[in-house]
Amino acid sequence: MSVHVLSVEVSVIKQFYALTKPRVIQLIVFCALIGMVLAVPGLPTWAELQLALLACLGIWLVAGAAAAFNCVVEKSIDAKMKRTAWRPTARGELADWQTLLFSAVLCAAGSILLYFWVNPLTMWLTFATFIGYAVVYTVILKPLTPQNIVIGGASGAMPPVLGWAAMAGDVGPEALILFLIIFLWTPPHFWALALYRVEDYRKSGLPMLPVTHGNEFTRLMVLLYTFILFAACLMPYVYGMSSWLYLIAAVVLNLGFCLYAFYLWRDYSDLLARKTFRFSLIHLSLLFAALLLDHYLL
């Protein structure tokens, strides 16, 4: 095999890998892992570790399938936006049939793995999440309503529920609390992004909130949602899922998020919107990391 042929094959593999939106999937699997950990009291057994690994792989495959499907549907939109113009589908480097076939293979492989080696409930919940994101959100909600992020956020909030179901075989109230936290976190996270990327969204024709309702209204919504999110993030402590370690982390992180949102509402700048968006990622990651530490240390 020539060096040129090998180089082309590696390039194609990288293109298919990019379709799965690796950074997004890392956060999805991390959130699913939190659900798995909290569903198991104490340290997991070797069998439980194996089950968790299989569940993570299955969820990763189906989530990657949903991301690839999204790339096909939104290729013309992606091509108009600086943030997404690099995607292989937007650049025309991969044909639609190739991407759809790739998506179907990933979805089938992940679903089979979850059904036979984890449990049927997790498979059906994961497949429902695939439909929720790939079809309900991407095809129906996103191009039609500025509330796309709010309603469509349900599919993005599912990972801890999937993780819990994988280990416990059911969906407990603890999993629903984690779902609620991510569900309420999603709008201010994406609206902060949309604020400083508003021209991209305007060119794309997507009815994001800053485009349809303006900058000032969107900033107010970001602020209000961070207040509601603050209350939701206290629920693991109130319900008895965690102790003082998580409580302290939740209070500090949510105060930080609320402060960013307040300053953004009071005196807007693209730089501050970008910082708010980045902090939202830190917020969720550290919040769940604190929940994980609390579970094992206290």
From Swiss-Prot:
Query: What membrane topology was assigned to this protein in its record?
Result: Multi-pass membrane protein
Query: Where found?
Result: Cell inner membrane
A biological process (GO) of this protein is: heme O biosynthetic process
What does the record's miscellaneous section state? Answer: Carbon 2 of the heme B porphyrin ring is defined according to the Fischer nomenclature.
Alphabetically ordered keywords of this record: Cell inner membrane, Cell membrane, Heme biosynthesis, Membrane, Transferase, Transmembrane, Transmembrane helix
Origin organism of this chain? Albidiferax ferrireducens (strain ATCC BAA-621 / DSM 15236 / T118) (Rhodoferax ferrireducens)
Q: Which gene encodes it?
A: ctaB
The superkingdom of the source organism is Bacteria
Name under which the protein is recorded: Protoheme IX farnesyltransferase
Report the GO molecular function annotations: protoheme IX farnesyltransferase activity
Q: Does the keyword Cell inner membrane apply?
A: yes
